[in-house]
Amino acid sequence: DEMSSRGLGDVYKRQSVNHVVCHGIPGDKILDEGDILNIDVTVILDGWYGDTSRMYFVGEPSMKAKFLTKVTYECLWLGIETVKPGSTTGDIGHAIQTHAETNGLSVVRDFTGHGLGKVFHAPPTILHYGQPNTGDVLEEGMIFTIEPMINSGKYDVKILSDGWTAVTRDKSL
């Protein structure tokens, strides 16, 4: 893999298109005009884990897709803005859930943000829904992801037969 050959360590990539919420397995499917594509990359370097993703549009997206991705991005930043020593994981989730639901969207319950470092899924667990002043208290030096997965329909997901890919149960974006 080109990224590994550049000294970036082990690299794992996932791609999620449209109603694939997360963990989509890369393939040779040709993307269509208006598709939403999320690329999720995990890098392991010298035993340390990194995790990032980025959302793209293929051509011109629908108004619904633009709205969903705009609100999801806002949810991410509202969650980030709550992060400081003494705040809680519930504060993050509450900020995200409130903004999503105020905009008529739903928050996936089955997947979370997570701590990372020498382990990929370490404490704390970052729910993207919840109540303020609940959950783990954040401390200086914690490293974790905030990964809000916001749906235009209901928040229910199902895992496909590959045992990995998660999609919206109602096939909504």
Locations of regions flagged by a protein language model:
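Single conserved hydrophobic/aromatic residue that forms the stacking wall/gate
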Residues: 1-8, 12
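Short solvent-exposed loop/turn micro-motifs enriched in small/polar/acidic residues
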Residues: 22, 93, 129, 172-173
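Charged, cofactor-coupling segments
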Residues: 30-36, 41-58, 130-173
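A contiguous pocket-lining binding segment that forms or flanks enzyme active sites
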Residues: 81-149
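Hydrophobic, well-structured mid-protein blocks that either form specific transmembrane helices
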Residues: 48-103
